[in-house]
């Protein structure tokens, strides 16, 4: 055996065969990765709140989790980890409803839909998820032209250049809702009330007050339909069955081996 453990296993479709083999163990946990349909809030027509709301209702999260991640992942309705005690479940606010999506597009002045770009980085959740989302958007009249990019291209065109309509990426930094307070960030969301809330949060030490602020922050970005909130990325690992002490969850992007040992 050349490999004894593989943290962050990239092929969820292969996990059942490992789980069925007594030589291996499969660990399924959670990450800090909010997987989102990132939306360029300054690029028409996504500068229109009604269009972003239509986009949200055009998306069937569970179909994406099932099709792209083979069932691994937790639906989210805002940019916050469901395992965090301050998480607010807002998934119902953007529930899948293709007829409502069509109605909202018509209200926004796009009864025939529109065309946009969907630029996808390499991870399978993005490539597979992108195909599923493109089909879901097509069903309500939105034609999303897919471009598959390598990471350097994605960083240049999308993250730095902001030359995109839509993209899919998992934001794996812990507790990073404060990125929505940066108007220059790649989804270009500019809300002074949210920015003030994040400043107040930074200056607040009382736990109850901070919790209330974080819940308000989640609600603001959900109400503004800044991005399409898809799912919390699952932590998937495969290891030799005799290994103990591996982390099931991934609270950071590190693979912690300090407690790892072999069973006798």
Write out the residue ranges for each language-model feature:
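A local structural motif
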Residues: 2, 23, 111-118, 135-149
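Extracellular/periplasmic solute-recognition and catalytic clefts
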Residues: 1-43, 152, 170
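Structural transition elements
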Residues: 40, 46, 74-107, 125-128
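Short helix-initiation/N-cap motifs at beta->coil->alpha
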Residues: 9-13, 122-124, 146-156
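Short helices/loops that flank or line small-molecule/ion binding pockets
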Residues: 1-4, 16-21, 49-50, 131-140, ...
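Detector for C-terminal structural segments
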Residues: 35, 56-88, 125-134, 152-264
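Short, well-ordered beta-strand segments
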Residues: 6, 117-119, 167
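Short, hydrophobic beta-strand segments
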Residues: 40-42, 88-89, 112-121
């Amino acid at each position: 055996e050349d490999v004894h453990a593989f943290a962050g296993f990239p092929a969820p479709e292969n996990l059942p065969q490992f789980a069925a083999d007594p030589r291996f163990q499969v660990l399924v946990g959670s990450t800090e990765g909010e997987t989102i349909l990132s939306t360029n809030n300054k690029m028409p027509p996504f500068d229109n709140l009604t269009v972003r709301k239509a986009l949200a209702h055009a998306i069937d999260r569970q179909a994406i989790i099932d099709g792209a991640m083979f069932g691994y992942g937790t639906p989210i309705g805002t940019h916050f980890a469901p395992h965090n005690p301050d998480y607010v479940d807002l998934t119902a606010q953007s529930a899948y409803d293709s007829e409502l999506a069509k109605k909202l597009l018509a209200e926004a002045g796009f009864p025939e839909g529109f065309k946009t770009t969907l630029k996808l980085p390499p991870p399978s959740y993005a490539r597979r998820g992108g195909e599923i989302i493109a089909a879901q958007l097509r069903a309500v009249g939105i034609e999303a032209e897919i471009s598959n990019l390598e990471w350097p291209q994605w960083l240049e065109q999308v993250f730095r250049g902001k030359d995109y309509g839509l993209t899919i990426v998992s934001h794996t930094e812990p507790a990073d809702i404060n990125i929505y307070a940066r108007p220059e960030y790649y989804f270009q969301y500019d809300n002074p009330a949210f920015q003030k809330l994040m400043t107040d949060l930074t200056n607040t030490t009382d736990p109850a007050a901070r919790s209330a602020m974080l819940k308000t922050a989640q609600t603001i970005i959900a109400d503004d339909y800044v991005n399409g909130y898809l799912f919390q990325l699952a932590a998937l690992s495969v290891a030799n069955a005799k290994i103990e002490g591996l982390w099931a969850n991934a609270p950071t992007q590190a693979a912690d081996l300090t407690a790892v040992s072999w069973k006798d």
